């Protein structure tokens, strides 16, 4: 049995195998992050699904590591990357974010949209290069008013995720998304090389 075979993988595999074909439209947060003047280096897309954001980063010349628990989503992404001539830039990684961790200080951009786990966020913050950007969007507790089946731990608490950033980050954007009526919150933050001793 696949060591990752578990309820999350089965649920997402079923969704991607039977749902509509992915649009591969990049997430607006990814588009914003890619336009921020990133340092040299690769991009990490966490809980990526069949990610148009990973493709947009590759089209901008970035190497991309795209991690997801769904092997079906990763096959769709890999096929689209190959169709666009980007197969050499997009590296799908079949991983469960509950245990998979990126190397520290390795990525110019770390992106995650639609997933929340405080430990994963902490590892992502450490994986961002100095000068690089951490881009995150996740459900807030308010989302549970419409979707009570969402576990509380999958939703941001007040002040998160910005309140969990290490001290070597500057917050660029921290706001609820208009589209979700405050049911989601997004963050863009840049890791600085060093703080002055003022």
What does each model-found stretch correspond to?
Residues 1-38, 41-49:
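Conserved class I S-adenosyl-L-methionine
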Residues 132-139:
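Conserved beta-strand signature within the Rossmann-like core of class I S-adenosyl-L-methionine
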Residues 116-125:
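A short, conserved alpha-helix within the catalytic core of class I
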Residues 70-72:
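Conserved SAM/SAH-binding beta-strand->alpha-helix loop
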Residues 85-97:
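Conserved SAM-binding strand-loop segment of SAM-dependent methyltransferases
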Residues 50-60:
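Conserved SAM-binding loop of SAM-dependent methyltransferases across substrates and taxa
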Residues 102-109:
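A short acidic, Gly/Pro-enriched loop at the edge of an enzyme's catalytic core
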